[in-house]
């Protein structure tokens, strides 16, 4: 179907109003959720249990422990992600009381209360450490393991099934920088619908995506997905301009002029300071985002310790996906 034909079938001009916020229409009281004393007490009991009977983190299931208050907390998080702001920051867990592996267990169990925790790498790793490893940015080395800033993006946009939700559990904050930014792709979609429906229509057709080397050796290095999809009255988005530009290079296909113009127009909207909120994620906070309707970025940061010493900014990242398998792409295992 041609782009001009697609324009006739775009969604309504204004969609998903609770999620179509801007900097001036949202405040921190809408995304902050306090941790109850009851939940902290449950976590203290959980850690005591694991010290008596250590088990592999990924073998742990919420139902095996008494975590009713924490489960109620994560139900509140999910409600914000699905029907409200699309962003939730839980403030905060006493991570300083626990060892790193115990905090990993806490992060895993909290994420599991939201639903299926899925792989973030082709090797099946479901717990992903976001920290500066000292590696230079290059093919197969994501910005998440450097101290570089990141442009606005959604996670896993190259996958067959991108994660529904992305969580960051802050085990240590940076000495300087590392600020988190969030923007509504629903708002951006609405703006393009009003201003340039022809460019929005192009974003509903496929682009090549860099798969980041996270695939079998004999698989293609790029996949194909649109930026926007609209089905059953629900908008879904995948966004990472760098991965699209690199994807076309890897696929050996030229990025068309209309596609390039559409990406530039979308970037101008999400990069506009009026479109995003910014704050520092503090030690002990758990940040969750609706990854299919919101994009996030971070500023560059500086750590007190070098990566080689094992210190510095450390986030435990978790992906949740409601459908498909737990494997990276979400396809059934073969």
Q: What feature does the model see in each segment?
A:
Residues 107-118:
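A short alpha->loop->secondary-structure connector
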Residues 1-77, 82-88, 92-97, 104, ...:
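Active-site environment of non-heme Fe oxygenases that use a 2-His-1-carboxylate facial triad
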């Amino acid at each position: 179907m041609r782009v001009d034909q697609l324009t006739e079938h775009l969604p309504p001009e204004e969609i998903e109003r609770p999620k179509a916020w801007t900097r001036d229409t949202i405040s921190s009281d809408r995304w902050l959720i306090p941790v109850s004393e009851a939940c902290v007490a449950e976590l203290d009991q959980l850690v005591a249990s694991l010290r008596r009977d250590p088990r592999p983190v990924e073998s742990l299931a919420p139902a095996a422990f008494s975590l009713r208050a924490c489960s109620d907390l994560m139900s509140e998080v999910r409600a914000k992600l699905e029907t409200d702001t699309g962003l939730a920051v839980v403030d905060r867990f006493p991570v300083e009381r626990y060892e790193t592996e115990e905090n990993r267990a806490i992060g895993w169990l909290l994420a599991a209360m939201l639903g299926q925790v899925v792989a973030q790498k082709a090797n099946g790793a479901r717990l992903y450490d976001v920290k500066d490893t000292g590696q230079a940015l290059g093919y197969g080395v994501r910005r998440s393991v450097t101290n570089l800033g990141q442009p606005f993006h959604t996670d896993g946009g190259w996958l067959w099934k991108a994660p529904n939700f992305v969580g960051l559990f802050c085990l240590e904050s940076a000495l300087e920088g590392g600020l988190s930014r969030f923007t509504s792709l629903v708002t951006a979609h609405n703006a393009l619908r009003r201003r340039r429906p022809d460019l929005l229509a192009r974003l509903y057709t496929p682009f090549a995506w860099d798969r980041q080397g996270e695939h079998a050796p004999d698989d293609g290095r790029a996949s194909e997905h649109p930026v926007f999809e609209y089905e059953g009255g629900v908008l879904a988005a995948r966004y990472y301009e760098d991965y699209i530009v690199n994807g076309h290079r890897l696929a050996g296909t030229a990025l068309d002029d209309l596609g390039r113009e559409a990406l530039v127009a979308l970037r101008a909207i999400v990069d506009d300071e009026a479109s995003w909120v910014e704050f520092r994620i503090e030690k002990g906070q758990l940040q969750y985002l609706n990854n299919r309707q919101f994009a996030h970025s971070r500023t560059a940061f500086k750590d007190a310790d070098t990566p080689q010493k094992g210190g510095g900014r450390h986030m435990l990242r978790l992906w949740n996906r409601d459908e498909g398998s737990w494997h990276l792409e979400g396809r059934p295992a073969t």
